[in-house]
Regions:
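C-terminal functional modules
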Residues: 348-467
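N-terminal secretory signal peptides that target proteins for export/translocation
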Residues: 1-15
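Catalytic-core regions of glycoside hydrolase
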Residues: 77-80, 99, 121-122, 183, ...
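Conserved, mostly hydrophobic/aromatic
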Residues: 93, 187, 321
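Feature activates predominantly on carbohydrate-active enzymes
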Residues: 47-173, 179-183, 218
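Short, low-complexity, disordered segments immediately C-terminal to signal peptides
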Residues: 40-48
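Bacterial N-terminal signal peptides
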Residues: 20-30
């Protein structure tokens, strides 16, 4: 939801000390500065992937006697993706038993690159055409497409809750999308400034706006559905302003409206049943988990390891599970996304170590291609595996920054850079027509690492901040 992190002084780096707790379930990890050290080789990967010799059914099949998957809704969203990027992912969603795709509200911003949001203006015909293509492709593949909209974030004119004019301008865009045959919608109010606001009144106002929109949608289509993303979209909502807002929202919100929730935190190492039950009790509505993994907020970071730290029985509390992806690297995002699909389909049998190996095998046909993706994942296991709570956490550059501060560390840093260069070269050789955005990202990381290595004196400072 995008927590836009723009404070890194080195491209792709926004770092914070992370949790030391082991999150990997069946994966054994070694943590140290940056990506960790393992064994006698200080540059040996702390996270290792075992790719099976043969493919196995994937996602993990349901146990005998069980016919229904874990979560009812299982899928992903975009993140300022182009419509062609959404279209490219639909076959993978269908193949791996995902059934839900939501376009990010940033994709319909007036300027998705600069984050200009003039929500009151009619959606351009080119945007509607893109939505129409994605919605049609989803229907053909048996996938539910959901249109998302945010009438406040990055806008110099946030929607006024008591204004009929503002509502009608917002409704015009929902109506245009509904006319394309879309039946699922989202209204988002995440990440807005609420300082000094009457929080309980704000919850009621948001419920009123969502109810009004939902009523309009169902006038046109009695089977229309709406998911609302609240201001306090994380945590147990059991105290303070979060509780006041959430309970006020829940009391007034139409009972047929779903609510998004990201888990115990915003970008969180754990999503627990206890926190989910607490939040659901406060809001008293059906939940869709919006898992902020492997999202990088367009920071240049790569989070390629398996999703970990999600309780195996969350499907008993939440109706749906939606992953938040990398941007703009939608192709390489398929590796962690497939592990999310595996978890969402059969959470009780989910094994992250097995899942990441199977995901790589699904996406690569030859031993050399498998090895290229495996080595890339081991270089960039991601923030969950590395113990960080930041979407901009960059394992490679953090490691280089740490090494150049140590006596004799520059030699090791050169070796690490050489390793990244080798993986990048193999990715280019094995996939000449694929992973273009990932190749650009690796080139940027190599350049940034070289700059750190050549800089005299201490390593460049890296600003660390929480999301």
């Amino acid at each position: 939801m995008p927590r836009i992190l723009r404070t890194a002084r080195v491209p792709g780096i926004v770092i914070k000390a992370g949790w030391a707790a082991a999150l990997a379930l069946s994966i054994v990890l070694a943590f140290a500065s940056g990506c960790g050290r393992s064994g006698p080789d200080p540059l040996a990967p702390a996270f290792r992937v075992t790719v099976p010799a043969e493919r196995a059914p994937f996602p993990t099949p349901l146990p005998s006697g069980r016919k229904e998957p874990g979560f009812v809704l299982r899928g992903t969203k975009g993140w300022a993706w182009t419509w062609d990027q959404y279209l490219a992912e639909i076959p993978y969603l269908a193949r791996y038993k995902m059934n839900f795709l939501m376009s990010c509200y940033t994709s319909v911003f007036t300027d998705p690159v600069k984050f200009v949001n003039r929500w009151w203006e009619p959606l351009p015909q080119a945007t509607l055409a893109g939505i129409g293509k994605v919605a049609a492709a989803c229907r053909d593949a048996g996938i539910t497409y959901c249109f998302s909209f945010h009438p406040a974030l990055f806008s110099d004119r946030p929607l006024r809750y008591d204004s009929d004019e503002d509502f009608d301008e917002m409704w015009r865009n929902y109506a245009s999308v509904q006319a394309l045959g879309v039946r699922w919608f989202s209204l988002s109010y995440d990440d807005i400034d609420v300082k000094g606001r009457d929080i309980a009144a704000l919850g009621a106002a948001h419920a009123g706006l969502a109810n009004r929109l939902f009523g309009r949608l169902r006038e046109k289509d009695p089977e229309a559905e709406l998911i609302f993303c609240p201001v306090y979209y994380w945590g147990p909502a059991d105290q303070g302003e979060a509780r006041l807002y959430t309970e006020s929202l829940g009391r007034a919100l139409d009972k047929d409206i779903f609510v998004f929730w990201t888990g115990d935190g915003i970008v969180t190492p754990r999503i627990t049943r206890g926190a989910a039950e607490s939040f659901r009790k406060a809001v008293d509505h059906r939940l869709v988990i919006w898992d902020n993994y492997p999202v990088n907020d367009r920071s240049g970071a790569l989070h390629l390891g398996p999703v970990v730290g999600r309780d195996p029985d969350l499907d008993e509390v939440a109706y749906g599970y939606m992953s938040n992806p990398l941007a703009p690297q939608n192709e390489i995002n398929r590796i962690p996304l497939l592990t999310c699909a595996d978890y969402a389909y059969n959470p009780r049998a989910y094994d992250p170590a097995r899942s990441i190996g199977q995901a790589i095998r699904e996406l690569a046909e030859t031993p050399s291609r498998i090895a290229a993706l495996k080595d890339l994942v081991e270089l960039y296991p991601g923030n969950l595996i590395s113990g960080s709570a930041l979407t901009g956490y960059n394992c490679v550059l953090e490691k280089v920054a740490s090494l150049v501060k140590e006596p004799g560390g520059r030699k090791l840093a050169r070796r690490l850079i050489s390793r990244v260069e080798g993986v990048a070269a193999r990715l280019d050789r094995e996939f000449p027509d694929g992973y273009a955005e990932t190749k650009k990202t690796l080139a940027a990381h190599i350049a940034a690492a070289r700059d750190m290595l050549s800089a005299p004196g201490p390593a460049p400072s890296i600003e660390r901040r929480a999301p």
